Amino acid sequence: YTIFPSYGIHYSPLLVTHIEDANGDIVASFTPRMNEVLSKEKAYQMIDMLKAVINEGTGRALRGSKYNIRADIGGKTGTTNSHADGWFIGFCPKLVVACWVGGEDRDIHFGTMAFGQGARAALPIYGKKKKKIYDNGNLGITEKDTFDIPATYSPCDDGLQALPNAEDILYPEDENILEADDAFF
């Protein structure tokens, strides 16, 4: 997920950024290797889709009164078979955070989706930690940070146009999912 807020640039993990001597002088510094793996436009397209998870989908609890996060963020919930693992990965322009709830023994798992899905098990961890991050002014991460739309971005660059009133289309099977989901908020 780090390639999305970095607009398609992959940074190789780097454990040590510099080495100082006893006097505090930097004797060596290191920068991560980086390469473009996705165009800015495609990265922003993913950002836009993953923002919808927060604004309209399984991550929308972050917008509710419990967490009340109004920042420009994207994210993705995830649940493995038999509710053994719940995931939430969220990101803002300056930080990506992954939360996992699960265990090594695959036979031990939540009994139902009500508790075992990523939106119920891992997202609350993200919500609480994200509030603390925003409250800590020393980190340089604020709720006012926003994603920049690339100047060359076009949401319909494939030549396909959305259907008129596409947002109003709801299939009958979707209503049951939304009602069940709302019952937990």
Regions found by a protein language model. Give the residues of each.
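A penicillin-recognizing enzyme superfamily signal
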Residues: 1-172, 177-178, 183
